[in-house]
Amino acid sequence: MGKLEGAGMDIRCTQNIYKSANGVTNISYYILSPVGVGLRGVIQISHGVCEYFSRYTAFAKYLCGLGFIVCGNDHLGHGNSAPKSFDIGFFSNKNGDEALIADVKALTDIMKARYEHLPYFILGHGMGSLIARLLVSRYPGLFDGCIVSGTSSAHPANAVMLRVSNSIVHTKGSTCRSPLLQKMFFGSLLRKIPSPE
């Protein structure tokens, strides 16, 4: 990725890959490091559904300006971790949720090995906040802090949506693009956007 100008400083940007826990997909990850400043810590971003790490570049540059190294991966089925457009939104044929969590933990392990002397934080948004919450609960002490935004909690409609989702996947396959599911999960959000893609 090279260098970025931002926040009045140079920022070194690197992109690399590692093998997903699903054993098939290459996961793209990114590191933005401020150049020539005292480092205060590492912040790993776990993005939301229908997103990718590069959507957070401006925010990452801001954090670099404060002395933080920022990293994140494109989750399975997102960004450069979706090799073909057909793969967008698809995690894996089996245990995709666990692969998603393991992939975020893999980046944590990579970064902590490089920067073990720095405080380490995870920031998760939406789906990424659920991943962050699971990692914090499964691995106490792994992170020095956790920030969640746009997270969710138990809701009576979740059970209905899960049954409908499972029924569609069972009858049409795990890569089915369902307008009904899109409307159920994103309808209220998409109504707020004129001409959503």
Feature annotation, model-predicted:
Residues S92-K112:
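Alpha/beta-hydrolase active-site loop
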